Structure formats: C-alpha cells, structure tokens
C-alpha cells in the first residue's frame, strides 16, 4: 500500500489538529459542572456520558495524520484508566496543554530533545511533590467522600464505602445492571463461583429453588464422575456422619448423576453436585483455591490421586454452602489461616508480574474470593441510556476509591497541581531544559482553568487567587466558593493525579520530538462494474 509522508512542522501541525479535536471534545466534561457528550452507536440508543476514556475511544478522524494525533491522546486516557481507573479527562487536558506550549517553542527554534528532558525532569519533581502532600485515606467516611466526588453522587459514595467495608479493600466489587429503577448493594459473604447444581432435584428449598447445606463435606476433583462405583466407598463414609456432601467435579454424568439424585429424593443423604469453575489451567488454580479455603485436597492425576482411593481426609469442610441454578457460595471454609494467607501472597505476587489485563482481572477475583467476599452494586435507572451512563460513573468512582486507599488523597479540583508549581519552579535548569520546565508549569494550571471555564468562571482569575491562597484552600466550582478542599470533601486520589500527569508528559514529549509522520494513502473508491449490454434495469429488482 502506498504511503503519505509529512515532515517537521507539517507533520506536527497535522497531529496537533487531531489532538485538539479529541481534547476539545473530552475537556467539556471536566469538573462538577462539566457537560455530557452524546456518542452514536451502531445499534441501539446513543450513549450519553462524561467519561473521558469512553469518549476518547470512540473518536476516529477521517484524515490519517490527524487521526494519529487523536489516537496518541486516546492512549494517554486509556493508560491512565488502566493504572488509576479515573483521571482520563485531566490527562487529556494536560496532554493538550503540554503539546501546545511545546509546539510554540519548537516552532520558535528550540531543541525538542532539550525540551523533552526539561518536561521529564519537571514532571518527576511534580510527582514527588504530590506524593509528599498526600494524606492517607482511612475510615468509611473518607472513602465515601472520594467515591462521591468521582461519581457526583453521595448515594453512590455510600454504596462503595459500604461495599469496601464489608469485603475489604482487596475484595471483589462488581457492578451489574439492576432489573428495577433503584440502585442497591448486595454483599455475598464467602467464596462464590458461577456454577449451579446439575439437577434441580438436588434443591432443599423448593420455593427459592436453592440447596442449603449446613456443615457439609466437599469433594473436589478435576475428573469426570461417570461411574458411581468410583465414589461409592467415600459416599458410604460420609453417610455414616449424617452430614451433607457437595461434589465439585469436571462433570457428573452417566449412571452417577441419576444415582445421586435418586438417593437425594429418597432422603438417604443430602448431596449436591456442581461443575468445577473456570477452564484449563485457571480451573486447576480455582479448584486449588477452594481446597485451601476448605481444608481439602484436589483429587487430580497431577498429584497421582484416584477417586476410588480418596478418603475422608481429602474432603474439605465449610460452615454453610448455598447452591442455586447459577452459582455456589461457600461460607466459612475450614482451611487453615496460614495456608490461606500463603495462597493470597502467591496470587498477589502473580498480580505484580502479569502483563495481561484479562489475567489481572481473574487474579483479582480469585484474591478477593479468598480474602473476604463479593459485593455487587446493582445499578438501576429509568432508561437504558441513563443506566449505561450511571454504570460508567460508578465504575470510575470505584476505581478512584481503590486508588485513594492505595496511595492517599490530595486536594481536588486541580488544586494539588497548582500547589506543586512552587516546587517545579524552584528547579534550576538552563536553556531548552528550562523551557521544558516552563511548559510543565503552564500545563499544571490547565485543569483548574478548564474546570472554572466549564462552570462559567474566568480561569485566569481563579488561578491567580488560588496561587495566593493558604495551602489546601481551593475553588469549589460547584458553588463558586473558596473552601478548604479536603475538609469539604473535594479530593482526588494522588495515584489518579500523578498518573494523569506522567502519561500526559510522556506522550506529549513524543509528539514534540516527532520529525516525520507516515500514513497510509487512502485508496481510490472502486467503481461499480458496468451493467452488461442489453440488460433491463428492471431485472435488478428496482434497486
């Protein structure tokens, strides 16, 4: 395929046009009085959102050179979202500011490499200064404040703080669509996995269609149970204890399933069979998690174990197990605290080394199931469009809250970025390095300027007053008042703020040091084939 190539000023100018188109679309959403953006969808109703990364991912420009600029800013938003889960709009605003200020100086003859060096030095100083002024987040009320600021809803803040209190900071908090109009919180204590009973005849409560097992034994295997003779000796031993049994296996079929069901119906003993969760290697890991949680052993060929040789010592135990048609919940497994702690440490070490987003998500789920439980925030809204918008806001709020707990908080509304200006300005740099520092100094003001602008105030006036205000005092754009930001609950997680700045500086520096851009040449449209001579157009069906 033929290529189009642009050089130096032309290349940078084309990319900056793309940067501006994306950034100008995203930045209208910043702050408490930010507006919404409507996104057309190929199917269904349009999506109305103020989530920066969602908007950025939707933007595709016709001009290839402009589109490359837009995609680089979209990458800033995505990367910030991956690391901190929020702050994507701030990252976009900072990127645009650094690119614009930098381009002025490069056009005037400054060396882009020197500018890049200055930007990197200034950014590192700003990040260290942010960490130095961060305050730790502890307590339900502080967590609720962080979530409320991100979601613009005190109610959502309460749900998230309640969920984190119930399942712990490492706990799984999932966000689902509710069937009703109200948003509600549901907490499932213990380990839950998405496999239900293999036969409805195994239920103990016909009204709720669930099987409740009190103080059960648990048989855990990655094998298929087809022949009842394989587990008959074990069943006879369990029968003597007069306690129920849960079988977790690759599958239970053949003669084994009807035999178990028949004994259950006759009241011989209470047994429930479910399929093992997950697939492949992930299934083995999850079965091992269940075994450690319940104090049992996975009966697997990997360990040289056979079902027919299994004894009571291989069975796990729990205080209670509830099984419905879709899921199984194990409460208060009998595994040793030390073994569970070691397993949690192993999963955390795997989390640190994995590079796959999918693997990271699954490891976090496993960690949470071992560490405490699962909280589900069920989002309700009057319409599907409102539901999608609310769900995105709650996801952002949850991510921001986790980030706040991890690294602490700083004054929100862009105030913290203004606070660190003094430290960055004190850097003793010369030449183009000093120019790079000055570019960052100007960019640090931009989030406050945009928040004020979106709220109908003059940004420059707000910034001047902010620079001369006591530490911690900032501008509440929602009310137009000057307040103590942290006491008022206007806060940002330091992880969100620093990630936004670091990612913006990194990509903006790359754009400024770009000297050539190569794009695919658009292919000319292929003309439609000519109609054979003598063919009646009516034969084409009238199209």
UniProtKB/Swiss-Prot annotation:
It is found in: Cytoplasm. InterPro entries: Chaperonin_Cpn60_CS, Cpn60/GroEL, Cpn60/GroEL/TCP-1, GroEL-like_apical_dom_sf, GROEL-like_equatorial_sf, TCP-1-like_intermed_sf. Pfam families: Cpn60_TCP1 (PF00118). ATP binds at residues 29-32, 86-90, 413, 476-478, 492. Its EC number is 5.6.1.7. SUPFAM superfamilies: GroEL apical domain-like, GroEL equatorial domain-like, GroEL-intermediate domain like. GO terms for molecular function: ATP binding; ATP-dependent protein folding chaperone; isomerase activity; unfolded protein binding. Forms a cylinder of 14 subunits composed of two heptameric rings stacked back-to-back. Interacts with the co-chaperonin GroES. Belongs to the chaperonin (HSP60) family. Together with its co-chaperonin GroES, plays an essential role in assisting protein folding. The GroEL-GroES system forms a nano-cage that allows encapsulation of the non-native substrate proteins and provides a physical environment optimized to promote and accelerate protein folding. This is Chaperonin GroEL. It comes from Streptococcus pyogenes serotype M1.
């Amino acid at each position: 395929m033929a290529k189009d190539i642009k050089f130096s000023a032309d290349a940078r100018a084309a990319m900056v046009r793309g940067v501006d188109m994306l950034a100008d679309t995203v930045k209208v959403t910043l702050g408490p009085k930010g507006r919404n953006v409507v996104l057309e969808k190929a199917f269904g109703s349009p999506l109305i959102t103020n989530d920066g990364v969602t908007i950025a991912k939707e933007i595709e420009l016709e001009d290839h050179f402009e589109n490359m600029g837009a995609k680089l800013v979209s990458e800033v938003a995505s990367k910030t979202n991956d690391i901190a889960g929020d702050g994507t709009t701030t990252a976009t605003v900072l990127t645009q500011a650094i690119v614009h200020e930098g381009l002025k100086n490069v056009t005037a003859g400054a060396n882009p490499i020197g500018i890049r060096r200055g930007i990197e030095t200034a950014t590192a100083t700003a990040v260290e200064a942010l960490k130095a002024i961060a305050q730790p987040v502890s307590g339900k009320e502080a967590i609720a404040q962080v979530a409320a600021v991100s979601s613009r809803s005190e109610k959502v803040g309460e749900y998230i703080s309640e969920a984190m209190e119930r399942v712990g900071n490492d706990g799984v908090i999932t966000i689902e669509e509710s069937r009703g109009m109200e948003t509600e919180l549901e907490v499932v204590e213990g380990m839950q996995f998405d496999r239900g009973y293999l036969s409805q005849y195994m239920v103990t409560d016909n009204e709720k269609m669930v099987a409740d097992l009190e103080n059960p034994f648990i048989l855990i295997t990655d094998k298929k149970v087809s022949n009842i003779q394989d587990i008959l000796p074990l069943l006879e031993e369990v029968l003597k204890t007069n306690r129920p049994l849960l079988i977790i296996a690759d599958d239970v079929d053949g003669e084994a399933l009807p035999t178990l069901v028949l004994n259950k119906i006759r009241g011989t003993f209470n047994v429930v069979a479910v399929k093992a969760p997950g697939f492949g290697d992930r299934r083995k890991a999850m079965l091992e998690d269940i075994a450690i949680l319940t104090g049992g052993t996975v009966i697997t060929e990997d360990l040289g174990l056979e079902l027919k040789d299994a004894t009571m010592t291989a069975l796990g135990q729990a205080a209670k197990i509830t099984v419905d048609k879709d899921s199984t919940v194990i409460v208060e497994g009998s595994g040793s605290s030390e073994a569970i702690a070691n397993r949690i440490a192993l999963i955390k070490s795997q989390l640190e080394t994995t590079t796959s987003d999918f693997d990271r998500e699954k490891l976090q789920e496993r960690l949470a199931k071992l560490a405490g439980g699962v909280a589900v925030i069920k989002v309700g809204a009057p319409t599907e469009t409102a539901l999608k918008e609310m769900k995105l806001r709650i996801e952002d709020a949850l991510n921001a809250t986790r980030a706040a707990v991890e690294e602490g908080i700083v004054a929100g509304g862009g105030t913290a970025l203004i606070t660190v200006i003094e430290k960055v300005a004190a850097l003793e740099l010369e030449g183009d390095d000093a120019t790079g520092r000055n570019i960052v100094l100007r960019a640090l003001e931009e989030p406050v300027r945009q928040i004020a602008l979106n709220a109908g105030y003059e940004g420059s006036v707000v910034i001047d007053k902010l620079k001369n205000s006591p530490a911690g005092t900032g501008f509440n754009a929602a009310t137009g008042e000057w307040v103590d930001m942290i006491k008022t609950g206007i806060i940002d997680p330091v992880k969100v703020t620093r990630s936004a700045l670091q990612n913006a500086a990194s990509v903006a520096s790359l754009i400024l040091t770009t000297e050539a851009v190569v794009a695919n040449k658009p292919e000319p449209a292929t003309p439609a084939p000519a109609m054979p001579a003598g063919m009646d157009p009516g034969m084409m069906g009238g199209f």
